[in-house]
Amino acid sequence: MIKLYANDSYKSFSLIFELDSREIDYELHSQDEASALGYNKLPVLVIDNKILDYKKAMRYAKKG
């Protein structure tokens, strides 16, 4: 399962848009949940316990 930890930033919005346009399924989690897990720099995409920062997450989303 893919988990997206996002906030209200432009980067989060653009990543959500890219994931949705490629029809990639993900669970959306809040900034509070991210902070509780120690993710301070959002957005963060977690795939099979592998943490992807914004740049890597966008690459993943664009590959579909």
Predicted regions span which residues?
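Local sequence-structure signature of Cys/Sec-based thiol-disulfide redox active-site neighborhoods
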Residues: 1-22
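Thiol-based oxidoreductase modules, predominantly thioredoxin-like and allied folds used
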Residues: 5-7, 23-34
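A short acidic, often aromatic-flanked loop/helix-cap motif at beta-alpha or helix-coil junctions
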Residues: 33-36, 59
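Short secondary-structure boundary/hinge segments and terminal tails
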Residues: 36-37, 52
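Structural micro-motif
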Residues: 38-46
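Non-catalytic, surface beta->alpha helical segment in thiol-disulfide oxidoreductase systems
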Residues: 46-64
